């Protein structure tokens, strides 16, 4: 009613050609902006200029809102600069515009200049809850979390200004802390809030889910159910379904689904995708597919959820069949496909799918690159790794820790250790993941001295190792054979690092002792293990025994391996070769006959070359290729040339065939 009166006053003033107060003009500009009448607003602003009306904060805020909605920030800033004495109204109008357009650094700059200005001493010019919420939104949306000092400054301002009791500010603080992986600070803010709403609960539950704290996510959901003031909504259960799917907790997820139905939560597309993703990840693929088939509306996330589920359970053909049905393929679906193929060791298809993705016009992101790089590593494609590295630098993806560590792994495993070190040196995020990657790189090359040096540097800089880091360090000693140093680190795991040795660490120690020629010590070490040895432990002993030619210990290890992994052809091959080297031909033949009875065949050697049409693989003794006759003729010619020039002995050539 009041707004209508103000508009009437402003219009009357226009008819009388008289200057009216700024408040009336402000309401009129707000009305025209809301109804998308930009020409009317421009005419009003022109009239304001003609009559030399100095816009107050209310009128200025409406003009700023109009111009920023039109993406005319220069005019908005001009209006802002004309304000004689600014207050929260005008500052907030510009802050809201900056954050809504994701102009986060402009928002930071404006806020810092505001709290440092002379007008800040006035109560009317102090930031309010809207101002703080805008800055927190900007902090949450910005990937450069080195802005931590500004975040601490804002948090301090919140406490000093008494804004910590404001629910919107509290929610903003939770969102910021969860997005920069500081879940402990987020929980502290949540616990200290005197008033909470559904958004508070959802922000905390989502934070736990996204940070991988799945049990805490489920506990927070149960606490929300126990709170009579709030009920979970669609946003809540999406986060919980994601946590249940990632932790393969089918039972808890079923309870969530049941509660969702009881509370009549509306099933929109996002929630349907979350439900399908949960069932697919937990292995209930038939039910997930039934829900998928019933959906009238699907998007790329829907397809990606089913494809990821198929891939996670090794159903590659089913995933590819569904993928081929899609008419429009989004980036998330491409990523699900490429990631799934990589996890199932279909590395040739990964590289070819990536090429097809580029051909179709999809632009790869960090998820794509971190899935592609392991396949390039497997295919010994260092050139491809360098090309992806260059692409990552050009597109700013080299700041992503998973892309960075995949590049380090690619370079290290393909012999470019200097390149791996350079990538690490340029890494802005020296997190534990990055340290572990470079330590592993030196471990692969058997450089235990460099691995240990990096391990010490990491600790001096305040980064504590985890179980994966310690596995990398121990594996370095396995390559170098320094059993004393390995034993020292292994013995200090619990006392110094508070990490209980796992089966991977025991396997590394067996490998260290075996490669150092201490097979008896390795046998004794296994006998004293507090956990049952897995195939990896016996495999380490077998490899050590095969190197030293200890037939009895090798046979002892193989007997266990035949029980644990009867279809692993590598174990049979090693044992048969050991018997052959010892001249025990009958036993070697018995092992080979056992393979035949089970239906096992030695996995043939494979090599690759990259052509313009993609990656081409070649299998040893394969004659199925239509040009195999031509290829073998070329090989025979090369062999004859090598033999004539005495590059290799004739006997070695015969054995090669």
Curated annotation (Swiss-Prot):
Keywords: Repeat. PROSITE patterns: PPR. GO terms for biological process: RNA modification. Transmembrane segments: none annotated. One of its GO terms (molecular function) is RNA binding. Residues 613-643 are annotated as: Type E(+) motif. InterPro entries: E_motif (IPR046848), Pentatricopeptide_rpt (IPR002885), PPR_At4g14850-like_plant (IPR046960), TPR-like_helical_dom_sf (IPR011990). Residues 537-612 are annotated as: Type E motif. PPR repeats lie at residues 21-55, 56-86, 87-121, 128-165, 166-196, 197-232, 233-267, 268-298, 299-333, 334-364, 365-399, 400-430, 431-465, 466-501, 502-536. Belongs to the PPR family. PCMP-E subfamily. This is Pentatricopeptide repeat-containing protein At2g37310. It comes from Arabidopsis thaliana (Mouse-ear cress). The lineage of its organism: Eukaryota, Viridiplantae, Streptophyta, Embryophyta, Tracheophyta. The gene is PCMP-E49.
